[in-house]
Amino acid sequence: MTATQSPPEPAPDRVRLAGCPLAGTPDVGLTAQDATTALGVPTRRRASSGGIPVATSMWRDAQTVRTYGPAVAKALALRVAGKARSRLTGRHCRKFMQLTDFDPFDPAIAADPYPHYRELLAGERVQYNPKRDVYILSRYADVREAARNHDTLSSARGVTFSRGWLPFLPTSDPPAHTRMRKQLAPGMARGALETWRPMVDQLARELVGGLLTQTPADVVSTVAAPMPMRAITSVLGVDGPDEAAFCRLSNQAVRITDVALSASGLISLVQGFAGFRRLRALFTHRRDNGLLRECTVLGKLATHAEQGRLSDDELFFFAVLLLVAGYESTAHMISTLFLTLADYPDQLTLLAQQPDLIPSAIEEHLRFISPIQNICRTTRVDYSVGQAVIPAGSLVLLAWGAANRDPRQYEDPDVFRADRNPVGHLAFGSGIHLCPGTQLARMEGQAILREIVANIDRIEVVEPPTWTTNANLRGLTRLRVAVTPRVAP
């Protein structure tokens, strides 16, 4: 190779990936390769060290920026305009509200939000954080009503603190949302997913059985992360040697939604662009080579795209959404299930005596933990909650985690009771944006819990657990436990 030639770009599944937080591997941050690849800036290989591969796909990166850049620019504009409008109009409109310093971005709050939720729930129905310029709803009835009022509270400007838009199902309003949801619904319905139950049950047996042979062990890396990764990639049709790359790149790609006006926000944005390009190349390769089987969810959606009912962009974003939603939140549900049963050994005994309570116990665990802690909406017009009026154009945080522990809705909400059967909990959201993967998540959770109840008598935490500091998610990055096998009577 001459000095003027560039080596070929590495295959999509061989690039350096950001660490997988669920598996306990560190995120090593933004490397030079990530930055130059994402921004299209060529680098040179250092002959003495093997060096960093030269970025030779500038046109691809430019195309990625042209495709998603306008949405990011729009998000930045919305963020600035929203802050200005809220400060101007909201300054005189915050009667019947309470100021709060509750900030889900605070690592201390993210690690243990429940004392702060109790403060929110004891206060006014609407609370305002001036630092984040966000209005917070925490009571169950208010959160549920807001989630269902999609005419007044929009998802199209983003559902996180970083206002932005990409053609995701969660960040769309009717009629676009209705059309996309209609395409997805048949593949994620309970009847369609039943065909995957034997695979899910067998996977749960393997993973819990493996835990019994290597105790003590980290349940995040041995059970909680592998279970949803292998299940969702099989259901979607991207299983096999690429499954880990799909999951990790999906989590990297969604960083494009973090358009915070800060250095860390810019780094996340660059990482997101890099992840999107690599993930799309991997996805396109599988689709073009007939590797999306017709019996899978993405295989069916690909057929819809060929028939013109979905655009290529929408098909790709469905893949990203389902991988991220079906992997990370379910992994958090499973990892925290072990912690809950360790903290409540009497409930594990109860389940062993009454295994018919397993479905109810999973619903109670979802209420108790709420893997998705909050989500945001933007008011289209002034929105009234009691006597308080939230101005049009304002960011509103719906605190799922607090609502699911509202004593007005649930007796002794800070206690896990396997026989509670908390009908109507908000762990999966509510209204038209109810999580489309609820049936698969329940199937996985119940399969794991059945294996725990049948084979494990006691769970003991042997090291302090490590919690994610994600502002929107509640889950563990490490949980080392020792398990005592159940002895057959």
From Swiss-Prot:
Cofactors, names only: heme
Free-text disruption phenotype from the record:
Deletion mutant does not synthesize SMK and shows a hypervirulent phenotype in the mouse model of infection. Loss of the gene does not affect levels of menaquinone-9 (MK-9), an essential component in the electron-transport chain in M.tuberculosis.
Catalyses which reaction(s): beta-dihydromenaquinone-9 + 2 reduced [2Fe-2S]-[ferredoxin] + O2 + 2 H(+) = omega-hydroxy-beta-dihydromenaquinone-9 + 2 oxidized [2Fe-2S]-[ferredoxin] + H2O
Q: Which GO terms describe its biological process?
A: cholesterol catabolic process
Write down the top EC class of this protein.
oxidoreductase
| CC terms in the record's Gene Ontology section | cytoplasm
SUPFAM superfamilies linked: Cytochrome P450
Family assignment?
Belongs to the cytochrome P450 family.
Task: Return the protein name.
Answer: Beta-dihydromenaquinone-9 omega-hydroxylase
| Native organism | Mycobacterium tuberculosis (strain ATCC 25618 / H37Rv)
